[in-house]
Amino acid sequence: MTRVKRGYVARKRRKNILTLTSGFQGTHSKLFRTANQQGMRALASSHRDRGKRKRNLRRLWITRVNAAARDNGISYNKLIEYLYKKKILLNRKILAQIAILDKFCFSTIIKNIITE
């Protein structure tokens, strides 16, 4: 069987890892073994935090809608209940944007929901 030389493949693999970790501090961007560990850790953290970001944004939207709803004399819980009863399809992100950017429109929505 002929000999297979793997110098190029190994060098390319290490170069890819070191390129991934090029912005890291100290030996985490210079030495392959520590760079490899930190690269895997960074990818795991970014994967975990993408899910965490979604949860945090939903909490922020709910907080904003709750504050705006209480300014109009209704709790967040009742507002969502009335929206479901009237079959109005506004999600929390859109409600939060309306509450911040157009307070008059938000109060109009609440008045229409409550009165009917």
From Swiss-Prot:
Keywords: Chloroplast, Plastid, Ribonucleoprotein, Ribosomal protein, RNA-binding, rRNA-binding. PROSITE patterns: RIBOSOMAL_L20. Binds directly to 23S ribosomal RNA and is necessary for the in vitro assembly process of the 50S ribosomal subunit. It is not involved in the protein synthesizing functions of that subunit. Belongs to the bacterial ribosomal protein bL20 family. GO terms for cellular component: chloroplast; ribonucleoprotein complex; ribosome. It is found in: Plastid, Chloroplast. It comes from the Eukaryota. One of its GO terms (molecular function) is structural constituent of ribosome. The lineage of its organism: Eukaryota, Viridiplantae, Streptophyta, Embryophyta, Marchantiophyta. The keyword Phosphoprotein does not apply. One of its GO terms (biological process) is ribosomal large subunit assembly. The gene is rpl20. This is Large ribosomal subunit protein bL20c.
